Curated annotation (Swiss-Prot):
Function: Aquaporins facilitate the transport of water and small neutral solutes across cell membranes.
A cellular component term, taken from the record's GO annotations: plasma membrane
Motif (NPA 1): 112-114
One MF term in the entry's GO annotations: water channel activity
Pfam families with a match to the protein in the record: MIP
Principal place of residence: membrane
Keyword annotations of the record: Cell membrane, Membrane, Repeat, Transmembrane, Transmembrane helix, Transport
Name of the protein: Aquaporin PIP2-3
Organism expressing this protein natively: Zea mays
Region (Disordered): 1-25
Domain notes: Aquaporins contain two tandem repeats each containing three membrane-spanning domains and a pore-forming loop with the signature motif Asn-Pro-Ala (NPA).
């Protein structure tokens, strides 16, 4: 027997082929018992507050940036001031990092209907929980933007209210594609960063998971702010549209729902049926897909 054959039949081969990991069971489609548990309502409250804080900080950053760079308000050197697109991207990505870290152990730290939808399709959450999360996220977003308008009433409408709108020069198809791809990047990162198989092998992964998720949001914003202002989060887009309440924001609103939901669905399918399926063939873990 060749030396490499002996090595392949040793402990390392056993570690490779052994089913040292078992997926958690899929969440039930409808779990009525959840409605009797305080943990569900605590998680819903956490999603509401997290989305409120997310929209308050990020939209306030956008309004502040536009005010600082308004030549009429800040003088001829306005273009050199403000946080710039890079700073706005950091505000969105940084807040996601902070809020996911704070709420991951309570609600899973979704803060985004597209993320919730993707996890629902992958049977990570029940339909009941998914619906309550999405409602809480949308209400939290509306309240968060409402706070911005209340605190910055002099500038809110003048500088666009932080609403997502398709930029001039881009077609609706381009905007939709940008939202699909951007949300795919985010939800794919969520699945990869929170993969229980990876967590089982590396104990530090759950602690670090918010970092790549926040960084994904940051990178997507750099790419898509010039196109759509970056939605990738239907609650974020809806909250700003409700408070800003201008025709352009409402006319483009469908892009910021259809695009993210399609992107989330593609990411869920890719993770469940391509990446996990290949792992199953190698025998490294059992798939419930």
């Amino acid at each position: 027997m060749a030396k490499q054959d002996i090595e392949a039949s040793g402990p390392e081969a056993g570690e490779f082929s052994a089913k040292d990991y078992t997926d958690p069971p899929p969440a039930p489609l409808i779990d009525a018992d959840e409605l009797t548990k305080w943990s569900l309502y605590r998680a819903v409250i956490a999603e509401f507050i997290a989305t409120l804080l997310f929209l308050y900080i990020t939209v306030a950053t956008v309004i502040g940036y536009k005010h600082q760079t308004d030549a009429a308000a800040s003088g001829p050197d306005a273009a050199c001031g403000g946080v710039g697109i890079l700073g706005i991207a950091w505000a969105f990505g940084g807040m996601i990092f902070i809020l996911v870290y704070c709420t991951a152990g309570i609600s899973g730290g979704h803060i985004n209907p597209a993320v919730t939808f993707g996890l629902f399709l992958a049977r990570k959450v029940s339909l009941v929980r998914a619906l309550l999360y999405i409602i809480a996220q949308c209400l939290g977003a509306i309240c968060g933007v409402g706070l911005v308008k209340g605190f910055q009433s002099a500038y809110y409408v003048r500088y666009g209210g932080g609403a997502n709108e398709l930029s001039d020069g881009y077609s609706k198809g381009t905007g939709l594609a940008a939202e699909i791809i951007g949300t795919f990047v985010l939800v794919y990162t969520v699945f990869s960063a929170t993969d229980p198989k990876r967590s089982a092998r590396d104990s530090h992964v759950p602690v670090l998971a918010p970092l790549p998720i926040g960084f994904a949001v940051f990178m997507v914003h750099l790419a898509t702010i010039p196109i759509t202002g970056t939605g990738i989060n239907p609650a974020r887009s809806l909250g700003a549209a409700v408070i800003y309440n201008k025709d352009k924001a409402w006319d483009d609103q469908w892009i910021f729902w259809v695009g993210p939901l399609i992107g989330a669905a593609i990411a869920a399918a890719y993770h469940q049926y391509v990446l996990r399926a290949s792992a199953t063939k190698l025998g490294s873990y059992r798939s419930n897909a």
